[in-house]
């Protein structure tokens, strides 16, 4: 099967970062927008080239009058491509008010809950989302503004456990060209243009300033992200070397080097907890022997040259 340049680029990225193999069963998150419809068409072709299996999951957020039409649109697209389709309807606005969280946070939580629920039901092993280079840039800027360490600066990751992002190597302009050249239909989401969301403020107010300074700013950030992804792999190796994990606790060996702080933050992630900031991490490292700190639902006890982290 002949691949277009856009598809070849994604195929190379998948191989470089070992995102998929022929034994994988992959659930695609498809909303119907141009980015996820590109993902659908590219993965449909690559499934034949690489031999993996795909299905589609679509969450109807009930956030727009056209939401039911969007669901029907994606269902029809999957039918044409002979790809299994699974959907669920939720009321994001009601969930947002009831749980006192932002609409964006609520939507993401419900979306991934549905993805994992479907993943388990189908006995699949990976989820693929349509995040692209523009999303990567925006996430990196957002994290810098909020405050982050090197480990978190990488923004979005090509593969992390079940979640994969095979389109991080292409930007929005390339996606627009791909859907235009191939006459791929898609739906437009008005919330993508709402300046009520911090990420869209970055997209429509801050990004143009970067473009004036360096028209190829996204490629610069992508190169930086790749360096950080390599760094993250080294941090993970250090964590494996220095940690002993049991059912409800984790022992970390400290070696008085830069990686101590990084492996402490990974320990929090292992327990599904938000990691402490750099200042709080430094306080943990400097605790006296026998000292105890409780942070984000975890208890941390300082031993002579190690930390015991417990739920």
Curated annotation (Swiss-Prot):
GO terms for molecular function, please? ATP binding; tRNA(Ile)-lysidine synthase activity
Q: What is its EC number?
A: 6.3.4.19
Family matches, as SUPFAM superfamilies: Adenine nucleotide alpha hydrolases-like
**Catalytic reaction(s) noted:** cytidine(34) in tRNA(Ile2) + L-lysine + ATP = lysidine(34) in tRNA(Ile2) + AMP + diphosphate + H(+)
Question: Which BP terms from GO are recorded?
Answer: tRNA modification
| Ligand binding (ATP) | 31-36
**InterPro entries found in the cross-reference section:** Rossmann-like_a/b/a_fold, TilS/TtcA_N, tRNA_Ile_lys_synt, tRNA_Ile_lys_synt_N
GO CC, alphabetical: cytoplasm
Sorted UniProt keywords: ATP-binding, Cytoplasm, Ligase, Nucleotide-binding, tRNA processing
**Locations listed in the record:** Cytoplasm
The cross-references to PANTHER family, in alphabetical order and at most eight, read: TRNA(ILE)-LYSIDINE SYNTHASE-RELATED (PTHR43033:SF1)
What's the stated role of this polypeptide?
A: Ligates lysine onto the cytidine present at position 34 of the AUA codon-specific tRNA(Ile) that contains the anticodon CAU, in an ATP-dependent manner. Cytidine is converted to lysidine, thus changing the amino acid specificity of the tRNA from methionine to isoleucine.
Q: Which family does it belong to?
A: Belongs to the tRNA(Ile)-lysidine synthase family.
Please give the HAMAP family that the UniProt record associates with this protein: tRNA_Ile_lys_synt (MF_01161)
What the entry says about domains is:
The N-terminal region contains the highly conserved SGGXDS motif, predicted to be a P-loop motif involved in ATP binding.
The protein's name in its UniProt record: tRNA(Ile)-lysidine synthase
| Species of the source | Petrotoga mobilis (strain DSM 10674 / SJ95)
Query: What would be the name of the gene that encodes this protein?
Result: tilS
